[in-house]
C-alpha cells in the first residue's frame, strides 16, 4: 500500500496547534508576557514562508518563456550564476509587499538551532538576531518594532526549542477553501494571528481589553461607518490594529481597492504597538503608527492629519489621562473635559481630526450618555446642539471580556444634514437604537452579536440616513428597538442620550416558542453555577501567580 499522504493543516487545525504552543510556555510566564514570545515566532515563521512562496514564483518566472525574463532584460535564460543573485534581490520581494528575510534570519536556521544541529550561539540569540536583521532589511519596520527578548533567559532553551518545533508543524502556504476559492497564505495567517490575539485577551482578562476589541463590535462600527476606497482612516487608540483589518475587508468586500486606503494609528503601549505592526504586516496593510508608541492626548503622532473615518475603542472612564496638563486645549471645542474622566476628551480629540464631512464611531461606557459630572452634560449638549451626533447604540452586556461596565456606541458626523454624504438628510435628528436584548452567548461568560443582528442594526441606520442597499426599504421607528428623535425632544430631556429613554417598549406579543418560566430559572441557575466554577478557577490562577512573586 502506498504511503498515506500527509494531510495539510487547515486553519482550525492551525489555531489549535498554536494554542498548544502557548500552553508550553504557560508554566513559566503569564499571558501578558508569553504572548510576545509566541506571536513573534509566528511572525518569523510567516515572513519566511511568505518569502519562500514568492521565491518559488520568481523561479518559475526565470524558466524559458517565464514572465520575469523580459522584466529583467533577458532575451533568453539568464546565466546560471546570475540566478541566485536574482532570487536574493530584495526589491523583488519588498516591491510585491513581501518582507525580505536574509538567509541567516530564515526559519530553517532557527529550526536547525532548535533541533540542536547548530552549535552556539544560543537559540534565543539566533532568534533575536533574526528579528534585528529583518528590521534592518525592511525599511517599513522601524527599529524596535519586532520583539527581541528571546535571549533574556525568561524562557529556558528547552521550552523555546519545543515551541519552535511545534510551530514548524504549521503550513502557511495558500490553500483551497471549502467553497473552491483560493485562500492565500496571508489570509490564513491573518486568521490565525487574530484568533490567537483573542485567546490571549481572554487569558489576560481586563488587561487583554487594552489591545483587543470583540470582533462583532468592530464589525458593527465598520458596517455603520462604511469606509471607502481613497479615504483616510484613523484609530487614535488602535491596540493591536483590529479596526484597520476589518475596515480594509469592508472596502474590499464592497468592490474597492483596499490598497487605496490610507491607514493611521496610534498606540501608547510599546508591546501592543509591536503587536499592531506584526498583525497589520501579516494582513498586508500599510499603516502609519507614528514614529514611536505615544499617548494621543499629549504626543499626537499625526498632528496635521485630517481623516475621513475615525474609530476607536479607548479605555473606559480613565482618570489618569493627564487632563490637568492640557488646560484650554484647542481640541476642546465643545468644552473642557473633566480631569477625572477622559471619555469626552477622546470624542473631542477624534472630532478635531475630521476632514470635511468626516465621521466617527467610538465605544464608550454607558455613563457617557447621561453623566453631568465635571461639565460632561454641557459638553454633550453642545455636541448635540451643533448637530454632531448622528446615532446612539446601547449594546448588550457581556460583549467585552475585559470589563463588566455597560457600553454604548457613539456615531458622530461633521456637517450632518448639510454637506455630509454619510447622513445627508437628517439635520436636527438623532437615531437611537436599543440593542441591549440582542446577542447570543458564545460561552458561559461571553456574548456575541450574530450576523443577522449586525445586519439589522447597520441596516436600520443605513435606511434612516437614506442609504441604498438590497432589502433596506424606508426607515420606520420600531417600538423597543429604534426611534428617530428631534432636537426639540432632546432638549426636553436635558440632552440625555440613553436609547431606552426614547425607543419605548416593544409591543407585547405571545411567543409560542417562549421559554417556560421554570425552564428559564433552571437554565439561569446552571449558568450561575458555571460562573461560580469559573470564578473558582480564576481564583486558583491568581493564587498561583501570587505564589510565584511572593
Feature locations, PLM:
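Conserved Class I SAM-dependent methyltransferase catalytic core
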Residues: 24, 33-46, 273, 291, ...
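Non-catalytic, mostly N-terminal accessory regions of nucleic-acid modification and defense proteins
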Residues: 1-229, 288-301, 394-397, 415, ...
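Conserved S-adenosyl-L-methionine
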Residues: 207-312, 317-321, 325-328, 333, ...
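C-terminal, active-site-flanking charged/polar segments
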Residues: 59, 388-389, 399-462
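Short, contiguous acidic/charged loop-to-helix segments that flank catalytic cores in large enzymes
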Residues: 28, 321-341, 366-375, 396-402, ...
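Hydrophobic alpha-helical scaffolding
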Residues: 153, 182, 237, 265-269, ...
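Active-site lining segments that contact anionic ligands and/or coordinate catalytic metals
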Residues: 306-307, 329, 341-343, 357-365, ...
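Hydrophobic alpha-helix feature that most strongly marks membrane-spanning transmembrane helices
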Residues: 252, 281, 285, 315, ...
